[in-house]
Amino acid sequence: MKKVTGQIKLQLPAGKANPAPPVGPALGQHGVNIMEFCKQFNAATQAQAKEALIIPVIITVYQDRSFTFQLKTPPAAILLKKAAGLHTEKKKGSGAHKPGKEKVGQVTRKQVEQIAKTKMQDMTAGSLEAAMRTVEGTALSMGIDVVG
């Protein structure tokens, strides 16, 4: 069994990892081959690259400077922005500046359910209903209305 020397958590655009910050400095201090990681990450996330999603990744670095990485599902906020039409390649919108007072978009319960199903593997929620409530809470704090 290899000895783990570090674990790095990053959020990178799908299919667009490059040696520039934050990837280069984070991996460089652990002695990892940066280009090798970029190639592997970009190959693994090629399918999501068209959707311009941010993919969280956990990189485990071993004593012999080898590494493994685990991809997570995109953050709920990114998926909600996409569903509400706030997140596109051209327009990278943010949530409301005053959540609770102003609304920047809306999503249907069906879209919330779809996002919850996508996020279930990375959530600690015990059921789909609980996951949906979590996603609805995220939407509320972003100023996105849930309708239907």
UniProtKB/Swiss-Prot annotation:
The answer to whether keyword NADP applies is: no
A cellular component term, taken from the record's GO annotations: cytosolic large ribosomal subunit
**A GO term (biological process) for this protein?**
translation
Q: What's in the keyword line of the UniProt record?
A: Methylation, Ribonucleoprotein, Ribosomal protein, RNA-binding, rRNA-binding
According to the record, the residues making up region (Disordered) are: 89-108
A Pfam family of the record is Ribosomal_L11_N
PROSITE patterns in the cross-refs = RIBOSOMAL_L11
PTM notes: One or more lysine residues are methylated.
The disulfide bonds in this chain are none
Record's signal peptide: none
Which terms in the Gene Ontology molecular function aspect does this entry carry? large ribosomal subunit rRNA binding; structural constituent of ribosome
The reply on keyword ATP-binding is no
Q: Which InterPro entries match?
A: Ribosomal_uL11, Ribosomal_uL11_bac-typ, Ribosomal_uL11_C, Ribosomal_uL11_C_sf, Ribosomal_uL11_CS, Ribosomal_uL11_N, Ribosomal_uL11_N_sf
Tell me how this protein assembles. Part of the ribosomal stalk of the 50S ribosomal subunit. Interacts with L10 and the large rRNA to form the base of the stalk. L10 forms an elongated spine to which L12 dimers bind in a sequential fashion forming a multimeric L10(L12)X complex.
Known NCBIfam families for this protein? L11_bact
Q: So what does this one do?
A: Forms part of the ribosomal stalk which helps the ribosome interact with GTP-bound translation factors.
Hey, which family's this protein in? Belongs to the universal ribosomal protein uL11 family.
What is this protein's name?
Large ribosomal subunit protein uL11
Please name the taxonomic classification of the source. Bacteria, Pseudomonadati, Myxococcota, Myxococcia, Myxococcales
Chain's gene name? rplK
